[in-house]
Amino acid sequence: MIFSTMAKEFRYKGYTLQELEQMSLEELAKIMPARQRRTLLRRLKFGWSDQQKKLFKKILLAKEGKYKKPIKTHARNTIILPFMVGVTVHVYNGKEYVPVQIKPEMIGHYLGEFSFTTKRPKHSAPGIGATRSSAHVSKK
């Protein structure tokens, strides 16, 4: 058996990244899942929020090399679109900004999916009185 070491080219629903970047947002919405399609079509009809407009402007400037500072945003409900690929966006999780490197596989997902708002709890040993066997242990 001969295995190829060449990386598999990225495709989203059969389209390459270059084809996705050339599509209009209406065409892109047609191949998105229902929730993202609804959001995109509503944004096209009613307009993008001010936060999203600022985010898109900064991303386009960063891709041209004119914006050097980290791109920070609170807009966790922004859908990742093809023109955003290759940029690092710092997404607010309620406490801090988490850097998210946007990759082609993330197209169609929301920014908030990659910046978790909760941490996993770290439990220590149970305290005195936490179990029935430790209820009668002296507290000294």
UniProtKB/Swiss-Prot annotation:
Q: Name one GO cellular component term.
A: cytosolic small ribosomal subunit
Region span, Disordered: 120-140
Give the GO molecular function terms.
rRNA binding; structural constituent of ribosome
Q: Where is the composition biased (Polar residues)?
A: 131-140
Q: Which GO terms describe its biological process?
A: ribosomal small subunit assembly; translation
Give UniProt keywords alphabetically. Ribonucleoprotein, Ribosomal protein, RNA-binding, rRNA-binding
- Keyword Transmembrane present in the record's keywords: the answer is no
Does the record's keyword annotation contain Ribonucleoprotein? Answer: yes
One Pfam match, by short name?
A: Ribosomal_S19
What HAMAP family does the record point to? Ribosomal_uS19 (MF_00531)
Family note: Belongs to the universal ribosomal protein uS19 family.
Biological role stated in the UniProt entry: Protein S19 forms a complex with S13 that binds strongly to the 16S ribosomal RNA.
Spell out the protein name for this chain: Small ribosomal subunit protein uS19
